[in-house]
From Swiss-Prot:
Its EC number is 2.1.1.98. Belongs to the diphthine synthase family. S-adenosyl-L-methionine-dependent methyltransferase that catalyzes the trimethylation of the amino group of the modified target histidine residue in translation elongation factor 2 (EF-2), to form an intermediate called diphthine. The three successive methylation reactions represent the second step of diphthamide biosynthesis. This is Diphthine synthase. Homodimer. It comes from Pyrobaculum islandicum (strain DSM 4184 / JCM 9189 / GEO3). GO terms for molecular function: diphthine synthase activity. PANTHER family: DIPHTHINE METHYL ESTER SYNTHASE, DIPHTHINE SYNTHASE. The gene is dphB. S-adenosyl-L-methionine binds at residues 83, 86, 111-112, 163, 205. It catalyses: 2-[(3S)-amino-3-carboxypropyl]-L-histidyl-[translation elongation factor 2] + 3 S-adenosyl-L-methionine = diphthine-[translation elongation factor 2] + 3 S-adenosyl-L-homocysteine + 3 H(+). Keywords: Methyltransferase, S-adenosyl-L-methionine, Transferase.
Length: 249
């Protein structure tokens, strides 16, 4: 039996089902390259010592260590922060496990998407899509965040922007993200990410973080730390407008 388990965005968000599985399985693996995973919480409930897997273990080697455990007739769990099938997809592992004849159970966790909207007072019913703000690769900037926000602003829909993770595991800061967005505006010049564009910054959610509603021109000078997400609001209703003011700067 193979489990893919989400334990939420930070300490205290783990579910009863996740705890039950961690206390039953013989092999526990985890990855923390997609989000900050609370290893202390994982160890508190784990029956055995958890083994960390890098991106290459899961992608380049197709989860070889996991399948070695399963081939011995043991139960195995892969643990992630947040919800295991939203911000990152381990669908390839599920497909491979089923092709090999193993049963698979996905255990949902509190996702960053739901948690960020809960923290921000904004309606998730108006979420128009998700994009990622990435560092430039080879001097090339991804325009996907710009294009999606532009479309959603025209439709009165909110946009959730996830922030990049560097190859060395460092999470993009809100300041760096704001700088990327302002650079995109300088290139595209369609008024999407002007310095006075106000966004919601949800920083270090689940780790004693904070929520801020401020213009990009101020965020680019801030000292807020990652991991974080941005929500670009549009078409605020009266309830959203009043509530979001409590996070204003």
């Amino acid at each position: 039996m193979f489990y893919i388990v989400g334990i939420g965005p930070g300490p205290g968000y783990i579910t009863e089902r996740a705890i039950q599985i961690l206390q039953e399985v013989e092999c526990i693996f985890y990855e923390d390259y997609t989000g900050p995973l609370d290893v202390a919480t994982l160890r508190r409930y784990a029956r055995v010592e958890p083994v960390k897997l890098a991106r290459r273990d899961l992608e380049d080697e197709s989860g070889r260590k996991i399948f070695e455990c399963l081939q011995e007739g043991k139960k195995a769990a892969l643990v992630t922060a947040g919800d295991p099938m939203l911000a990152t997809s381990h669908a390839a592992l599920i497909t491979l496990a089923k092709a090999k004849g193993y049963s698979v159970e996905v255990v949902p966790g509190v996702s960053i998407i739901c948690a960020a909207f809960s923290a921000s007072c904004l309606s998730i019913y108006k979420l128009g899509g998700v994009a990622t703000v990435t560092y430039p690769r080879g001097g090339v900037y991804s325009v996907r965040p710009y294009e999606l926000v532009e479309q959603n602003l025209a439709r009165g829909l909110h946009t959730l922007l996830l922030l990049d993770i560097r190859d060395d595991g460092v999470f993009m800061s809100p300041r760096d993200a704001a700088e990327v967005l302002l650079t995109l505006e300088g290139r595209e010049r369609r008024g999407v990410f002007t310095r006075d564009r106000r966004v919601v910054v949800v920083s270090k959610l689940g780790w004693g973080g904070s929520v801020l509603y401020a213009p990009l021109g101020e965020i680019v000078q801030s000292e807020m730390e990652g991991p974080a997400v941005f929500i670009v609001p549009a078409g605020l209703n009266p309830v959203e407008r009043e509530c979001i003011k409590t996070f204003s700067k």
